[in-house]
Amino acid sequence: MREYDAAHYDVIVVGAGHAGSEAALAAARMGRETLLLTINLDMVAFMPCNPSLGGPAKGIVVREIDALGGQMGRNIDKTYIQMRMLNTGKGPAVRALRAQADKHAYHRTMKRTIETTEHLTLRQGIAESLIVEDGVCKGIVTNTGARYSADSVILTAGTASRGKIIIGELTYSSGPNNSIPSIKLSESLEDNGFVLTRFKTGTPPRVDGTTIDFSKTEEQPGDKEPNHFSFETPDSAYLKDQLSCWMTYTNDTTHQVIRDNLDRAPMFTGVIEGVGPRYCPSIEDKIVRFADKPRHQIFLEPEGRETEEYYVGDFSTSMPEEIQHKMIHSIEGLENAQMMRPGYAIEYDVVEPWQLKPTLETKVVENLYTAGQMNGTSGYEEAAGQGLMAGINAALKQTGRDPFILDRSEAYIGVLIDDLVTKGTKEPYRLLTSRAEYRLMLRHDNADLRLTEKGHELGLINDDRFDSYEVKKAAVEAELARLEKIRLKPTPEIQAFLAAKGEAPLKDGVLASDFLKRPEVKYADLIQFIPAVEGIDNRVVEQVEIQVKYAGYIDKEKAKIAKLKRMEAKKIPANIDYDAIEGLATEGRQKLQKIQPETLAQASRIGGVNPADIGILSVYIQQGKIAKVK
């Protein structure tokens, strides 16, 4: 193919999924001339698997993206068809919002946002090779021969990277949802010294909603109480006309159909070689691994208002199509369901994430960034968070500003990226609340208090929104201070209230804040006995109640975070020679050499690096010379 010089951009983003959309929008909004290149303009921010966003940990990531000035939260608030707050019976650290998306409206709305964003050009094309000179990425070449030069390139090719779809005995080269795969880009990465591995994910069948007998299933409606992903969205915009999801179950017949055909299941015949996601196994994998379970939950989720397609959740499979028909028809409510699309597995290339810096710039090629499923993660939310960070850091580097890195105590996005670049991953990485050491600080409700100031400093949060944030922050602080000054006396009314709640009576006067700390006392109860603040926002009330009730636990986490910050402040010289440091264990030395951690705290989280290694390294850094260990 004859090449030609097409154009120059400050930033080129390859791939317009959830990572690419956020990366391109961030770079453009920070004033960089940006090209967003996608294989198919009709698949911008598409949802090839579950038509939903959020859930435990992942929902908090969407809030963090919004607090930093990203688009995902605003986009889903405009296009959801159901909203539910999960884990409401548990503590605030694990509460999470989940939205059922109209996947087609989500795509259209995000595409329109991209098309109307200043400094951002959206174009269809297939990137086939990187332009690399002296270890520095200078642009890309497309399949039509167009040479686009750039100061930074961000790759977000997702599961299209040398993608291969598998349905039973059938295998063929493809990206997600039967899109065009990206083959030569993977080859270009390998030619430039990158180590790639193969992962696998899957998706369930889609069925025709008009052929489902919903009377045999359990309805799951949305919440009536307003909730939103974006801090910009007012409660008045909350959708009242929500669509329900539905729940049914597999049974003995389903399990027998699967067991009888395991000899045709790619998961067990060796056809699938890529490593699959631990926390989203296929239904055939679940039947084998959990043989004692009599049934498994199945969720029937609408894919939008203008379609009858239903996503059969928790039923991912790569069984042959004819077997998928039998599996579906064995399930209550789906006896006569017509399958519109079969489930499939897809294998794809992943850049081993130890080759990345915390900014998501690669260590192998300068000015080249990767984000999303290319880095070994699963999920739209994890991809979007990485894309946002890659776009921000590409823009910052070009303008000579310091890199933007969130640490583990600041955001789930920080936990995600630190896990990737420090520990790597041997399977598709899913963000879980259990991965965060400071999850009481990383809540759904306080993402704006954690990150809005940072988003404003980056230029991604405008002044009007920042002013609204400061008003909320001041209101929270004022109410917390007020409750520390008001005293309640053991009046007959208060004692009767406490008795009705099963709480111990007051013996003496007590501060309003201490009264609120009682497990059965809500803020709404408290203001029966003290003057109410007129017009106080319910989000302020939520914040006050959580901060008061969990003050002791929050203070403990703050103390741990202060210790972490001290370790993060101990920078490791970029040119350090680990071979020159006597006393390091062999495994620790090898891991440190491979990962090249930037701080002592990051080094301490590397698997195989023991506390003694950290002690030796700490002495070396402090003394600035080789640590002698007897």
From Swiss-Prot:
UniProt KW Cytoplasm keyword = yes
The entry lists its GO molecular-function terms as:
flavin adenine dinucleotide binding
The positions annotated for binding NAD(+) are 276-290
- Keywords in alphabetical order: Cytoplasm, FAD, Flavoprotein, NAD, tRNA processing
Subcellular location(s): the record lists: Cytoplasm
Q: Which Gene3D superfamilies match?
A: FAD/NAD(P)-binding domain, GidA associated domain, C-terminal subdomain, tRNA uridine 5-carboxymethylaminomethyl modification enzyme MnmG/GidA
Annotated binding of FAD, by residue = G15, A16, G17, H18, A19, G20
Name the cofactor(s) required for activity, per the record.
FAD
**One BP term from GO:** tRNA methylation
One Gene Ontology term, aspect cellular component:
cytosol
List, alphabetically, the InterPro entries matched.
FAD/NAD-bd_sf (IPR036188), GIDA_C_N (IPR049312), MnmG (IPR004416), MnmG-rel (IPR002218), MnmG-rel_CS (IPR020595), MnmG_C (IPR026904), MnmG_C_subdom (IPR047001), MnmG_C_subdom_sf (IPR044920)
Q: Give the protein's biological function.
A: NAD-binding protein involved in the addition of a carboxymethylaminomethyl (cmnm) group at the wobble position (U34) of certain tRNAs, forming tRNA-cmnm(5)s(2)U34.
Spell out the family assignment given in the record's similarity comment.
Belongs to the MnmG family.
Cross-referenced PANTHER family: GLUCOSE INHIBITED DIVISION PROTEIN A, PROTEIN MTO1 HOMOLOG, MITOCHONDRIAL
Assembly and partners are described as: Homodimer. Heterotetramer of two MnmE and two MnmG subunits.
Question: What name has this protein been given in UniProt?
Answer: tRNA uridine 5-carboxymethylaminomethyl modification enzyme MnmG
Source species of the chain: Latilactobacillus sakei subsp. sakei (strain 23K) (Lactobacillus sakei subsp. sakei)
